[in-house]
UniProtKB/Swiss-Prot annotation:
Entry's EC annotation: 2.3.1.-
Species in which this protein is naturally found: Escherichia coli (strain K12)
Annotated protein name in UniProt: Uncharacterized N-acetyltransferase YhbS
Stretches assigned to the N-acetyltransferase domain: 1-148
InterPro entries the UniProt entry points to: Acyl_CoA_acyltransferase, GNAT_dom
Stated role: Upon overexpression suppresses small RNA (sRNA)-mediated RhyB-silencing of multiple RNA targets; overexpression leads to partial loss of RhyB sRNA and other sRNAs. May act via Hfq.
């Protein structure tokens, strides 16, 4: 298994994985549109020994109170059903966080199960007076600081790219 930055030839495999992993094709369309419009900050794939995409995570820019603070949102994260339970999601997330830290990004936000994401260092964004536009997500919206001062004096609405409006 190999984890690496996605390349153009991976797009069909990523699309197929996302369509298999989620109830609708919304996530596949989201990644396609972010990629096509140049708003995919980082996409990482996990491939098997034959080069087939078996895992994927995407990161795209977010604004806080309308400002670009070098924050990104992590979504979607998917692992092929046959490879779940082997730590592949953890490896994808950690590789992404490490790369983003090296690139100088300040923080990462995500929507998901706190029991899962807290293991990666995410904490509830509401504890820092941060929220996203979707009502009822307070218990799922989380933040991970990459820079020590990323959360200093930062509060308010975290806005994802308009392509996320489909959700």
């Amino acid at each position: 298994m190999l984890i690496r930055v996605e390349i153009p030839i991976d797009a069909p495999g990523i699309d197929a994985l996302l369509r298999r992993s989620f109830e609708s094709d919304a996530e596949a369309k989201l990644v396609h549109d972010l990629r096509e419009d140049g708003f995919l900050t980082l996409g990482l794939v996990a491939t098997d020994d034959e080069g087939q995409v078996i895992g994927y995570v995407a990161f795209s820019p977010v604004d806080v109170q309308g400002e670009d603070l070098q924050w990104v949102g992590m979504a979607p994260l998917a692992v092929d059903e046959k490879y779940r339970g082997q730590g592949l999601a953890r490896q994808l997330v950690y590789e992404g966080l490490d790369s983003l830290n090296e690139f100088g990004y300040a923080a990462v936000v995500t929507l998901g199960d706190p029991a899962l994401y807290s293991r990666f260092g995410f904490e509830l964004a509401a504890h820092h007076d941060l929220r996203c536009r979707w009502p009822g997500t307070e218990s799922a919206f989380q933040v991970h600081r990459l820079a020590d001062d990323a959360l200093n004096g930062v509060t308010g609405l975290v806005e994802y790219h308009e392509h996320f409006n489909r959700f």
